[in-house]
Design a protein with these regions (language model features):
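Short, cationic-aromatic polyanion-contact patches
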Residues: 84-90, 176-195, 250-260
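Short, hydrophobic-biased segments on the C-terminal half of alpha helices
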Residues: 63-64, 158-162, 232-239
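Loop-centered beta-sheet repeat module
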Residues: 154-231
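Phosphate-backbone binding and catalysis cores of DNA-processing enzymes
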Residues: 1-153, 288, 294
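Glycine-rich, small/acidic residue-mixed loop/short-helix segments
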Residues: 289-309
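Non-catalytic regulatory appendages
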Residues: 237-287
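Short, amphipathic alpha-helical interaction segments positioned at domain boundaries
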Residues: 93-109, 186-207, 211, 264-270, ...
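A short, conserved structural fragment
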Residues: 68-77, 81, 165-175, 239-247, ...
Length: 309
């Protein structure tokens, strides 16, 4: 018999699983690793999102230090959008998501005349430019390329660098003032034991459910960019590690994690995972508001409900 949960319990579980209530972690990189990946196109807001989940409140300096040291990396790994990923997890995440992000980028690759030989040629060039800790900004990389190598369509460099990220060649380097730099991934993140594709997929999906659940299959596919078939395969592999619960006529997936905690009220940063991790936000959004727009507009969360902005 499927267990039924009310809305408050859904919110209590999500708040606890996301370390937004009774957080236990004091290391910024551990928070990022706990959540597998955290959306981070707004850099200052993403640092704040980490701080919300630190048991000691953390500090901007502590998060910056973890990023500069390469313990937290910032690159395009889902959908594609900038995300924070812990260095220890980056190869796992890329193994699961890179192919899907390349597929999402295929139209832009074609539009920018970036065929595979050109993309691979750039990746080889940038590997040489960044070798031996030579961290460069995007502008510096562009200037160092052979004359006429990059077109004038505007997005060329963004997609060239994204390709190199997805191939596991480049990642974020330490910031230089307010400017992000690029570095070689192999110089920033130690190699980790290789997993089979099935093991990597099951681990990735299981960690999402333990840190975001209860969540639906559409929540997971929207957040991760994975296909329904991939998610179903992962659920088969996870077996009884995942249970199905019901709330308001919807089926939710739940994995072992922190027990439901208290409700909490807080100011939520733009693009925070409490809003962005779900396609269906009806369980966390006030019924009087458009929950598709609230989660990235510096929302006010009252007792776990996104109540305004």
């Amino acid at each position: 018999m499927t267990v039924a949960l009310d809305g408050d319990t859904i919110r209590r579980l999500r708040l606890a699983h996301q370390q937004l209530v009774a957080p236990t972690l004091t290391d910024p990189a551990a928070v990022v690793s706990h959540l597998v990946a955290m959306q981070a196109q707004e850099y200052a807001m993403a640092k704040w999102a980490i701080g919300l989940r630190l048991a000691d409140g953390g500090s901007d300096e502590a998060v910056e230090s973890a990023c500069d040291a390469g313990r937290i990396l910032r690159l395009h790994v889902l959908r594609p959008t900038w995300h924070f990923v812990a260095a220890e997890d980056i190869r796992l995440v890329l193994q699961v998501t890179a192919k899907r992000v390349h597929q999402a980028n295929a139209f832009m690759y074609r539009s920018l005349d970036l065929d595979t030989p050109r993309l691979e040629s750039f990746t080889d060039l940038v590997r040489g430019l960044l070798a031996h800790g030579n961290h460069l900004t995007r502008k510096e990389i562009r200037a160092a390329l052979p004359s006429g190598w990059v077109g004038d369509k505007g997005f060329d460099m963004a997609y060239l660098l994204m390709y190199a990220e997805l191939q596991g060649v480049v990642c974020s380097g330490p910031r230089r003032g307010n400017q992000p730099t690029y570095a070689l991934l192999d110089e920033r993140a130690a190699c980790t034991p290789e997993l089979s594709d099935d093991d990597a997929l099951a681990q990735f999906v299981g960690r999402y459910l333990r840190t975001r659940g209860p969540a639906t299959v559409p929540d997971l596919t929207t957040w991760s960019g994975l296909t329904v078939s991939q998610v179903k395969r992962a659920l088969t592999l996870l077996g009884d590690e995942v249970t199905t619960v019901e709330s308001d006529g919807r089926a939710y997936l739940l994995a072992d994690g922190e027990p439901a905690g208290d409700l909490r009220s807080f100011l939520m940063p733009d693009y925070d995972e409490y809003g962005m991790a779900y396609k269906d936000r009806s369980a966390i959004a006030h019924p009087d508001h458009d929950y598709w727009t609230l989660p990235w507009n510096r929302a006010v969360v009252v007792d776990g409900v996104i109540a305004g902005a």
